[in-house]
């Protein structure tokens, strides 16, 4: 019979194995729920037998009392910084210096890595056990952050494998992925906590918490990139091979590393990473180029506080300081009034930025922003530039406050802010030109009425020339009237008239989505269409009736109910359906229990990409066969249909034990 000690050893080994697969190999083999179950089992056994708890147990990541201050750590091998280059010419000059100093360049190979935008840390392992973690500090002395680092699941408390040196100091970067950063700030805004300016600040703030229980709640992760102290063992004489060895021992290493032989290949790597930067999921601020051979590194040596054999090739800065010239207010499709900072133009991440969103009145208050202030602007990837913070030390005397308008800046209607909402809205509806433009652009968009050739610039002209006031007016346009628009010849005008005629035949779900009801996206529109079947039934539905639709709660139900209660909206709908002639196939309303179908009465979720039919068509077919089509997976879900590139919904369905079929099986059951 297995002893308690053996069971504890087996559980710890299994959990470390799954941590290695998840954090290092990026290939988990069990769902999170199974990992959590094993952890609960281990924790229960250790609570029953506290004398058998070991420091390297996966349960011992959190548990120490809060510190009053951090102790100092002196680095036995200094943590040096890197010299920076900011353009190709400077990198080529670095490459020339390297070549000039070497006796021979035959063996010269560069190892190219990502320059992570986090916090550099030192991890000291003794006989494979993590005994200390420290910040870089000034390079000679850092702070002891061992208790906090132990909470980071990507960092192994015990190395795996053989031939581990007696004392090994691993160096790397602790950072916060974008998704985790957004989650932390969302929670902070909800609770009135501290909102971080960027992921790096959030990572640094998380690591420097005196209470490790706070750090444990932050989704920090780690990549290693080098070694400091090495005693009682050997490592390969290639930097790349060292990283591969670290990975084998259970330490996470970035998979974006490449060995190259020429400066041209380095530049190609740099530009490829720069292009991929928005999709990485975490912040980087450049690439690091290192001579791969340890022998050549030793020949090159160091200068001052940086190695001669490595350089950081930085991307254009993502943050810059500039001045707020003014704040203007834009009106969106739903009437939301958004303040926009007009800035002294400044280059940020290679783009000239002159505007930045301020989101809403609460954000202006949080920033303490005044017109004339010096501010820090951040732009990451394709994200709209944002004001990160006000530089109060640079505030001039002549600043003035930002005043939210009492009337819509476009139509003059009163504005309102509903209690509990952050957004201020114009009450003008379709009489507001700004709302009209955005509402019409949404109405004709591909996923709505799908009017081929009706672009934003055409809508702008139609509204400005007062040819169109409501969606129905679009369908009354003639080729002659359209020909008067910029860059619109007779043939293009006739093609657009034909496209409008074709768009009159649609689906109930598309029509609902096109109306632009607040909080009603494609999935919700499809659910409403499937549940009610007819427009009349939906218009007459109560808030309680609406909440019977899968994934429709009180907020969405109230928005839908209020939309149809508004007489002007009902008039627009009558005009579209009765006068213009927009129509869709009549539903065959049959009770689910009367339908002889494998989908009847089941709650079905679609995920991934379907190749044989559109998502809307699939939802309509399933609904006609008695299914309730939902947009999210829950315990109430009966069936998940997984197309290509299915993601988190598939994983959750598998975790909950929900039946999963592919598109081919769905088509077979549909009788296709």
From Swiss-Prot:
Enzyme active site: 115 (n6-amp-lysine intermediate)
Keywords: DNA damage, DNA repair, DNA replication, Ligase, Magnesium, Manganese, Metal-binding, NAD, Zinc
Obligatory cofactor(s): Mg(2+); Mn(2+)
Reaction catalysis annotation: NAD(+) + (deoxyribonucleotide)n-3'-hydroxyl + 5'-phospho-(deoxyribonucleotide)m = (deoxyribonucleotide)n+m + AMP + beta-nicotinamide D-nucleotide
Gene Ontology terms, MF aspect: DNA binding; DNA ligase (NAD+) activity; metal ion binding
Annotated binding of NAD(+), by residue: 32-36, 81-82, 113, 136, 173, 290, 314
UniProt cross-references to SUPFAM superfamilies, sorted A to Z: BRCT domain (SSF52113), DNA ligase/mRNA capping enzyme, catalytic domain (SSF56091), Nucleic acid-binding proteins (SSF50249), RuvA domain 2-like (SSF47781)
Gene Ontology cellular component list: cytosol
Gene3D superfamilies: 5' to 3' exonuclease, C-terminal subdomain, 6.20.10.30, BRCT domain, DNA ligase/mRNA capping enzyme, Helix hairpin bin, Nucleic acid-binding proteins
Binding site for Zn(2+): 408, 411, 426, 432
Domain BRCT residue range list: 594-672
Protein name (record): DNA ligase
Native species: Cronobacter sakazakii (strain ATCC BAA-894) (Enterobacter sakazakii)
